């Protein structure tokens, strides 16, 4: 039997999850359905909101659900998969697509999701600048907003930016360290994995099997 790729495995499971999430209109509905799933399955579903490098490093595959553009949740969240695709298209036009992780965007039961690629190593505080040329560095700063260590990893020795569409409409102020950018500071409060810290301003939820 042909072994499925991580995109194919992720797509099959994303369809199962999306069907379970039909009828969920609040964060509590959504959270309750995940807990219900975990009580009836041997392989527990891990989750995190926003971006999660640890999940991408350890997971068999990673599924990122974005809230539907029409406001899947009753509080009116908007999805950003279309923004991610637009940023990737701009990268292709500029010959810089190799800097970005290419996600597989799918829609099941009205819910948009993307199957995330796996990265070999998370970003380190110092070292990203040794993997890019001055032209590549300039493109990243001119086109992406959230260039902090939780948003990139390394693939084949080169930087690979993940989740690059988050509010990607304004360039950051270039500094000697991406972690000192205002976007990094604004994102650090959104990295907790506890239920009680589920942020009302996050735009996505990531699922994976450890």
List where the protein language model places each region:
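Juxta-kinase regulatory segment immediately upstream of eukaryotic protein kinase catalytic domains
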Residues: 1-42
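ATP-binding glycine-rich loop module of kinase domains
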Residues: 43-90
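Generic beta-strand structural signal
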Residues: 57-58, 107-108, 154
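Protein kinase-like catalytic core scaffold
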Residues: 61, 114, 160-162
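Conserved structural core of kinase catalytic domains
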Residues: 67-69, 89-133
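Active-site-adjacent loop/helix micro-motif of nuclease/hydrolase catalytic cores
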Residues: 70-84, 123-131, 170-172
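Protein kinase catalytic-loop region centered on the HRD/HxD motif
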Residues: 136-143
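Catalytic activation segment of kinase domains across protein kinase-like and atypical kinase folds
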Residues: 145-191, 195
């Amino acid at each position: 039997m042909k072994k499925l790729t991580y995109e194919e495995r992720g797509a099959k499971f994303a369809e199962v999850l999306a069907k379970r999430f039909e009828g969920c209109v609040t964060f509590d509905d959504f959270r309750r359905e995940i807990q219900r799933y975990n009580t009836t399955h041997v392989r527990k579903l891990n989750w995190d909101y926003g971006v999660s490098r640890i999940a991408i490093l350890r997971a068999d595959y990673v599924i990122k659900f974005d809230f539907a553009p029409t406001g899947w949740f009753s509080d009116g969240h908007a999805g950003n998969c279309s923004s991610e695709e637009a940023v990737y298209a701009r990268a292709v036009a500029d010959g810089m697509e190799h800097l970005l992780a290419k996600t597989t965007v799918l829609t099941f039961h009205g819910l948009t999701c993307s199957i995330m690629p796996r990265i070999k190593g998370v970003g380190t505080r110092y070292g990203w600048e040794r993997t890019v040329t001055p032209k590549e560095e300039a493109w990243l700063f001119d086109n992406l907003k959230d260039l902090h260590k939780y948003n990139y990893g390394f693939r084949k020795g080169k930087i690979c930016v993940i989740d690059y569409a988050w509010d990607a409409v304004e360039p950051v102020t270039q500094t000697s360290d991406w972690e000192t950018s205002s976007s990094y500071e604004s994102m650090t409060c959104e990295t907790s994995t506890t239920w009680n810290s589920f942020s009302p301003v996050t735009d996505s939820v990531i699922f994976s099997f450890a």
